[in-house]
């Protein structure tokens, strides 16, 4: 092995990527998990494999100039991280949020590579976005920004090269604007974006897929300890697409979901969600672009300003908001309150110290690369439908999604070993994803 110790490799990654804490956090977590496996299988330390694995194949950064409704010109920064094409075209979402920077997108693309490998579908890993904030912008401004963004991005993506999708700040509306501009610029109607509307090539179940998939994965985790969602108390963070459909599926399976949240605070409803309450939340968030405080006022629930949901006693926690939203103090509270299971719906929502706390406890903990892979899995199914010029019924897509999540769970269990008397889903997800990507890289030579 080129690197005698794990610390030596991490130091090299840190030195090569200064000022990128999120990327360093993600790579450290994965490599720490993989190191014992690599020591037992030294072929994965040959040919500079680890160095190549943590280095993106391509980083595209560009200026996005656009005009607001008053005629003023704004300049934002756009990115596309094409991390790995070892097992297929780059695949990963586009995020519009003021926090977007190179470190965050490199971490997301790195994680996406393993997540996509876990689905077993032929998709590489990528991620993109901009520091543009769509909140408070008119539909016309959002459209003009999306068109300006794609006027550069279109040079770097394609149905067999790189297939973006939505993410935070990028929903069906934004994907539609970008897909339309892409078609105009390229004069092609290929599947260059997933997450499209049903009227122009989208897939049924795609909006629900990440939230549904997270719950399907957690359901398999609970089955291994002889439990089900029926009658369990569940906390969900976030109130966007992932959170909404996690609430819907968990409620359908008999759980009582007692929290949702956004950046303004947390709503606690001890009576639990109902389909009617969920419809109100979707109206507030998806149509009025309001806050969870508006939802609480409409349904008579309790709103806790600037609070996170993790102090509420529950059996299952589903963090579905954003990275590093759940720290070691939150983890300690969940453990103390008797939580059985934590399954991540967001990307890396638990800090490194929180993950350690969960792994050292009796709590079943699933990292996002495994438990929230349902979104990209269904994007892969959308690509398949587009390539065949078909549209599968809702039941078929949902069935395929459920099967994929069960298979990912089985792969995690197969590679997860036994840590503290339980399966380590962290090790299982990292090793299963790594083996598929690494085997492909070794087979293709040093490229």
Question: Where do the language-model regions lie?
Answer:
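Active-site nucleophile and cofactor-binding loops and adjacent substrate-binding regions
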Residues: 71, 167-168, 203-210, 235-239, ...
